[in-house]
Amino acid sequence: MRRPNGMIAILTGAGISAESGISTFRDQNGLWENHRVEDVCTPAAFLKQPTVVQRFYNERRRALLSPEVKPNASHQALARLQREYKDGQVVIITQNIDDLHERAGSRQVLHMHGELLKVRCTATGRVFESREDVIHGESKCECCGVVETLRPHIVWFNEMPLYMDVIDEVVQNAGLFVAVGTSGNVYPAAGLVMIAKAHGAETLELNLEPSGNCRDFDRSVYGPASVIVPAWADEVLHGKGPAA
């Protein structure tokens, strides 16, 4: 396969952060406080039980900010690739709501499912950084001064992912599309590889195991993200073997 030519679009999923110590918050029965996580992460759930939903995200936010959670070698490798790749842009499209790409030094990151360390005003749509707990009925919005208007800046089930116009443009103009740590089962993210191929891009899957759409990729490499992603980045930057 040919080496990357021009823009590289990289889609990352939960697998890239799995080695960074982020908890899933599910017990052995797949529940959180006797709730299915899928039942907490919906607009209807927020309307019905906002206190419960805020508590769920407060716990996740505190866990993300704990000292033991930090970027791993795969995040660092992608940040280095963004800094050092000379033949075009490297754009990261992530399904993850953590900030580990940014902590590793990446700058061009499109969070299609939102960001855990941000909140959004339901009255104005404005988005704010937030590292503190959000208490329903107490936490006051910065822009409107009203309590009960803040919600997590997260794309819930039945909501449209963010930045899709930009993401489509990036994928359509990429010379190489790479998916790292994705399940291949969540759309529209899982459909991006076929958009890239339709516009002439080479495609590569880097994953712990075959994803749900692994057959859509031209080439696949399997193993821990902290091992295979740095190795691939070295291939791109220093010509050590096939890059795509």
Curated annotation (Swiss-Prot):
Binding site for NAD(+): 13-32, 95-98, 181-183, 225
Domain of life: Eukaryota
Catalytic activity: N(6)-malonyl-L-lysyl-[protein] + NAD(+) + H2O = 2''-O-malonyl-ADP-D-ribose + nicotinamide + L-lysyl-[protein]; N(6)-succinyl-L-lysyl-[protein] + NAD(+) + H2O = 2''-O-succinyl-ADP-D-ribose + nicotinamide + L-lysyl-[protein]; N(6)-glutaryl-L-lysyl-[protein] + NAD(+) + H2O = 2''-O-glutaryl-ADP-D-ribose + nicotinamide + L-lysyl-[protein]
Subcellular location: Mitochondrion
Database matches in InterPro entries: DHS-like_NAD/FAD-binding_dom, NAD-dep_sirtuin_deacylases, Sirtuin, Sirtuin_cat_small_dom_sf, Sirtuin_class_III, Ssirtuin_cat_dom
GO cellular component, one term: mitochondrion
Stretches assigned to the Deacetylase sirtuin-type domain: 1-239
EC number: 2.3.1.-
Cofactor: Zn(2+)
Domain notes: In contrast to class I sirtuins, class III sirtuins have only weak deacetylase activity. Difference in substrate specificity is probably due to a larger hydrophobic pocket with 2 residues (Tyr-57 and Arg-60) that bind to malonylated and succinylated substrates and define the specificity.
Function description: NAD-dependent lysine demalonylase, desuccinylase and deglutarylase that specifically removes malonyl, succinyl and glutaryl groups on target proteins. Has weak NAD-dependent protein deacetylase activity; however this activity may not be physiologically relevant in vivo.
Protein name, UniProt field: NAD-dependent protein deacylase SIR2rp3
Organism expressing this protein natively: Trypanosoma brucei brucei (strain 927/4 GUTat10.1)
